[in-house]
A protein has these predicted regions:
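Extracytoplasmic metal-acquisition and chelation regions
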Residues: 2-354
Length: 354
C-alpha cells in the first residue's frame, strides 16, 4: 500500500512537470508571434505613412475649377481631389471660409482657384498658409472689364421723365447692381468663354505637372484629350457667328458677357441679378427702353434668378428670353461642362434662327 501511494505521488509530480513545461512553451510561442505581429504592425504603419506622403492632395475653390481639374487628374494614381465649396454653391461672391474649410486647406499640396478676385477669401488663406501652392487658372487669360457690358446704358424713354425721387431711386438700384458681384474692375467669370476655359485647363495642367513631375505626361495627356472636346464646342460657336455677329443683346448675369464675346454679340445692357436684390420699376422701364432703342431680340438670363424679370419683359415686348446655364453648379461629373455648354449653344442657335 505504501509503495502504491509512492507511485501515485511520483506520477502526479511528473504530470505537473509536463503541464508546466507545456504552459511555458505556449507562452514562449505566443510571445514570438506577438513580437512578429508588432513588427508587422509597425511595418504596415510605416508603409501607410509612406503611401500618405506619396498622395498629392489638390483642393479646388468651387465647381468650375473642380470640373476642369477633375478632367486633368482623371486616372492619375496618387492624386486626391477635393472641392472647397458644395457643388451647388455657385459663384463665391460672399463665401465665408469655415473651420472645416481651413482644415481641408491645411492638408492641401495645391489649391486651384479661378482668380480675378472671385475668391474674396484668398487673403485669409495666404495669411493662414503662406507656403500653400496656389494655381490661379485665369493667370494667362485676358479677362473682360466690368465695363464691357453696359450697365449704365442711357435711353430716351419714359423712365427719364420720372420725378427726381424716382430718378434717385433708380440710381441707387443701379449702384446695387454694379456692386452686387463686385470682384474689382475685372469680370472674373472667364470659364463661360470656351476659348478662355481651354487656356485655363492648360494652365492648371502645366502647374500640376510642375508640382508632380512624376505624372506630368499623364496630366498633359488628359488636358490634351479634354481640350479636343472643348475645341469641338468652340467650332460650333464659330459656325454660328454668321447669325450672331453684331447682334445687340441684353444680359441678366455678368458671366454672360463672355458668352456675348465668344459669339461676337454686343451686350448693350447688363442687369446683374442674384438672390440678394429685387428689381425696381425704373430698372424694368430701362430694360424695356433698351430693347426698343437698340433693337434687342434676345436676352440671356439665368433661370435661378432671372425667371421673373424674363417673364416681365417678354410679356411687354417681343424679346426672346433664353435661360443660359452659368456652369457654376451641378453634379460632380467630369463631362458636365461639355453638356452644359453644348446646351447653351443650342439655345442661342434656336433663338437666332427663329
Amino acid at each position: 500500500m505504501k509503495n502504491k501511494c509512492k507511485f501515485v505521488g511520483i506520477m502526479f509530480l511528473c504530470i505537473l512537470i509536463v503541464c508546466t513545461l507545456a504552459v511555458m512553451a505556449y507562452e514562449h510561442t505566443a510571445g514570438m508571434k506577438g513580437a512578429a505581429g508588432g513588427a508587422s504592425d509597425a511595418s504596415d504603419s510605416a508603409k501607410n505613412t509612406d503611401e500618405a506622403d506619396d498622395i498629392l492632395t489638390v483642393v479646388t475653390s468651387f465647381y468650375p475649377m473642380y470640373i476642369a481639374t477633375l478632367n486633368i487628374v482623371d486616372g492619375v494614381e496618387g492624386v486626391r481631389l477635393e472641392n472647397l465649396s458644395e457643388p451647388q454653391t455657385g459663384c463665391l461672391h460672399d463665401f465665408q471660409l469655415t473651420p472645416e474649410d481651413m482644415k481641408l486647406l491645411s492638408t492641401a499640396d495645391v489649391f486651384v482657384i479661378n482668380g480675378g478676385g472671385i475668391e474674396s477669401f484668398m487673403s485669409d488663406v495666404a495669411k493662414a498658409y503662406p507656403k500653400l501652392d496656389v494655381v490661379e487658372a485665369c493667370e494667362d487669360v485676358a479677362l473682360l472689364s466690368e465695363d464691357d457690358a453696359d450697365s449704365d446704358h442711357d435711353h430716351d424713354h419714359d423712365a427719364d421723365t420720372e420725378s427726381d425721387s424716382d430718378h434717385d431711386h433708380d440710381h441707387e438700384a443701379d449702384a446695387e447692381s454694379d456692386s452686387a458681384h463686385d470682384h474689382g474692375d475685372e469680370n472674373a467669370h472667364a470659364w463661360m468663354s470656351v476659348p478662355r476655359y481651354r487656356t485655363m485647363v492648360q494652365t492648371i495642367a502645366s502647374r500640376l505637372a510642375e508640382k508632380d513631375a512624376k505624372h506630368a505626361d499623364e496630366y498633359y495627356a488628359n488636358a490634351k484629350a479634354y481640350d479636343a472636346k472643348l475645341a469641338v464646342l468652340e467650332e460650333k460657336i464659330n459656325s454660328l457667328k454668321s447669325l450672331t455677329n453684331g447682334q445687340n443683346i441684353i444680359i441678366f448675369h455678368e458671366a454672360y458677357a463672355y458668352v456675348a464675346d465668344d459669339f461676337s454679340m454686343n451686350a448693350c445692357y447688363l442687369l446683374d441679378l442674384d438672390e440678394e436684390r429685387s428689381v425696381s420699376a425704373g430698372e424694368i422701364k430701362q430694360v424695356i427702353g433698351a430693347i426698343k432703342d437698340d433693337g434687342v431680340s434676345v436676352i440671356l438670363a439665368e433661370e435661378l434668378y432671372g425667371k421673373i424679370m424674363g417673364y416681365t419683359v417678354s410679356r411687354e415686348t417681343d424679346v426672346h428670353v433664353i435661360y443660359i446655364d452659368p456652369l457654376n453648379r451641378g453634379e460632380y461629373d467630369k463631362d458636365s461642362y461639355l453638356y452644359g455648354m453644348e446646351h447653351n449653344i443650342e439655345l442661342i442657335k434656336e433663338a437666332f434662327t427663329k
